[in-house]
């Protein structure tokens, strides 16, 4: 999307597929869209906003290392609860490398809290890869929207980057 388009607006146009996982950052806390993902039988993991209002209805007592809590919750804010009436999971995770806590919400009730944290960590690796692409390969935006078009543009930029590095030596 263009930089001026808010992430949650772009989220509404995305074609969600059943059984797929969608990993979002805090900018995507749009409970109407998250409920749509849930209804198409897809899964999401999203960083929770600090002001999330909820009520815990169930807790897991035995927690693996770095998992601070793993609970089933319901939203208590009027509109959030109206837009997402189902329960989902809230995971509090301590990242020892960054020395900070992350809070995730997910409708993937069948995976562990550590798997939730790992899914988000992998999303962050993708963010870092795209940051590297922008800095080193000078890709400002993608010309096409299909997977093949994006791959071709990335491969062409990587080849150009390598050729320039060889010539400079």
Regions found by a protein language model. Give the residues of each.
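Single, function-defining residue in the core of a domain
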Residues: 1-169
């Amino acid at each position: 999307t263009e930089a001026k388009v808010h992430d949650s607006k772009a989220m509404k146009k995305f074609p969600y597929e059943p059984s797929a996982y969608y990993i979002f950052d805090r900018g995507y806390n749009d409970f109407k869209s998250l409920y749509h993902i849930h209804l198409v039988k897809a899964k999401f993991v999203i960083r929770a906003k600090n002001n999330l209002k909820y009520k815990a209805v169930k807790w897991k007592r035995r927690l693996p290392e770095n998992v601070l809590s793993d609970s089933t919750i319901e939203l208590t804010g009027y509109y959030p609860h109206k837009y997402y009436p189902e329960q989902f999971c809230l995971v509090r995770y301590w990242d020892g490398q960054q020395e900070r806590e992350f809070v995730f919400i997910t409708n993937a009730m069948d995976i562990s809290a550590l798997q939730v944290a790992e899914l988000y960590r992998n999303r962050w690796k993708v963010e870092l890869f795209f940051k590297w692409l922008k800095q080193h390969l000078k890709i400002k935006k993608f010309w096409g929207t299909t997977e093949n078009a994006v791959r071709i543009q990335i491969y062409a930029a990587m080849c150009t980057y390598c050729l320039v590095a060889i010539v400079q030596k």
